[in-house]
Curated annotation (Swiss-Prot):
Protein name stated in the entry: Dual-specificity RNA methyltransferase RlmN
Family listed: Belongs to the radical SAM superfamily. RlmN family.
Recorded name of the encoding gene: rlmN
Native organism: Xanthomonas oryzae pv. oryzae (strain KACC10331 / KXO85)
Record InterPro entries: Aldolase_TIM (IPR013785), Methyltransferase_A (IPR040072), RlmN_N (IPR048641), RNA_MTrfase_RlmN (IPR027492), rRNA_lsu_MTrfase_RlmN/Cfr (IPR004383), rSAM (IPR007197)
Residues annotated as catalytic: E114, C370
Record has Disulfide bond as a keyword: yes
Residues reported to bind S-adenosyl-L-methionine: G187, E188, S219, S241, L242, H243, N327
Amino acid sequence: MNEVVIPSVLQDVPVRTSEPRKQNLLDLDREGLERFFADTLGEARYRAHQVMKWIHHRYVTDFDHMTDLGKALRAKLHQHAEVLVPNVVFDKPSTDGTHKWLLAMGTDGKNAIETVYIPDKGRGTLCVSSQVGCGLNCSFCSTATQGFNRNLTTAEIIGQVWVAARHLGNVPHQQRRLTNVVMMGMGEPLMNFDNVVRAMSVMRDDLGYGLASKRVTLSTSGLVPMIDRLSTESDVSLAVSLHAANDALRETLVPLNKKYPIAELMESCARYLRGSKKRDSVTFEYTLMKGINDQPEHARQLARLMRQFDNAVQSKDAGKVNLIPFNPFPGTRYERSGETEIRAFQKILLDAQVLTIVRRTRGDDIDAACGQLKGQVMDRTRRQAEFRRTLEGQADRDAAA
């Protein structure tokens, strides 16, 4: 049975009670940092701006190295604050230039998440995680087999950007190696709404990483109420993990569809576009799996759905399709569609005047491609154990054959 952990049960990291907790400044966006400097430190707002630039532009975490701060202010910062970035367990480059980091979450060494940098001509995209594991159970995703532990804090989310940007030698507004961020790593971002939105604010802030709103993309499996809330609280690009254009098939791939079927999902996407003149399209991600969702009829269903969406928002190319060849992982029952089937599927969509691209597989030699991230999860569900038993049963059957 596919298990879905609903948002109400997802909890953030427990607060330590053994000693007064210092404020991790990575947990704060500009507004929060200004408030902390005024209320806790009794300092002017511009001091918060200075510190924010030290952290995100120069990658300095030691207050004593922030040379334009006075000695008294540095002492107050040492007393009340800290800058804790994720610990890098390992970093692994791919032959195609993709780079993956395994980052420890917390101090117990039991949980870790993966972050991936994907360079391309004229751009560099960072794929960022939002949870340790995932609260959903999409049947074709490696992360789902690991179960779920907890939401990431704002510091742990923006810390992934900090680690990658520092490694790349990224200098905001000058030498920009990191041009795009996609919330497409481990986890469902909208199940960790507040922390994700706060982190995306830092990504887009000139005192942070200075990315344009359209260059920060949040990908969701389709939490309809949270899409509506996102429309009022942020202005980033929206991507939807669709993977099927009919409810019966999508429910087997994305169990959340049982709660929020395709019609409701598409209506929420239309509301998202209507909510701001800055938004002109939604990207619909469609992972192609051999014999599952890659047949001509599936393409025609998707084309009809995209035309209906364009009509609903009265805009051509409001719905863009990103076809993703399935990336296998150990124990999966799915296979990647053949190149012939992928191109035939795309042609049907293009002939129907649906803007469609095929995502080039990157980083699969280091298990960094879409759907392959799994990290290290102390599972609070039964999913990891169930998947392990499935693998063992499969090995026994293979040995007996």
